[in-house]
Amino acid sequence: HKLQERYDLLLEDLPIIKPYQDKDSYSALHLYPIKIQVNKVKNTKKEIFEALRKNGISVSVHYIPVHTQPYYENIGFKKGCYPNAESYYQRSISIPLYFGLTLEQQDKVIESLKQVLQ
């Protein structure tokens, strides 16, 4: 949880919404998804994602709305059916958080985010 707490502290001033963590519960914290405040940044999510990847940061996408998958589109689901799921997807990426992530690696993630979001 030290890495998560460090992200919480060091990402404080960035135009993102950090994951909610209930103080009375315990989580495995296998992901650290952030929501980009797209109205406060100049780059698109795709540009941010690609810039981070180019800088060697293993960002991921979580979660693609199920109703936009080909199977569900073939049985009648359409984009716009679940606007909250689509909005979350359009603004969210997961930054590295895993056992073995070093402070130096985490610093690189943080610095890369600061560069691409400001």
Q: PLM features: what roles do these ranges have?
A:
Residues 1-118:
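PLP-dependent aminotransferase class I/II
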